């Protein structure tokens, strides 16, 4: 999300950095990670926060999560 203006990178309610939350194979919703902030679910149009996620981006995050797991 670094190629977007600050208004689309930081939460308009609490100024936390927004994150993509995968909801389907190639679609994510842009959400605020703060537990006390309801963005974007407190907005009138939540669908405006849906975005396409490229397969390469999904795989990159999955590999990172797998490699960061503690190994026995």
Curated annotation (Swiss-Prot):
Keywords: Cytoplasm, Nucleus. It comes from Saccharomyces cerevisiae (strain ATCC 204508 / S288c) (Baker's yeast). Its main location: cytoplasm. Present with 3140 molecules/cell in log phase SD medium. This is Uncharacterized protein YNL162W-A. It is found in: Cytoplasm; Nucleus. It comes from the Eukaryota. GO terms for cellular component: cytoplasm; nucleus. The keyword Cytoplasm applies.
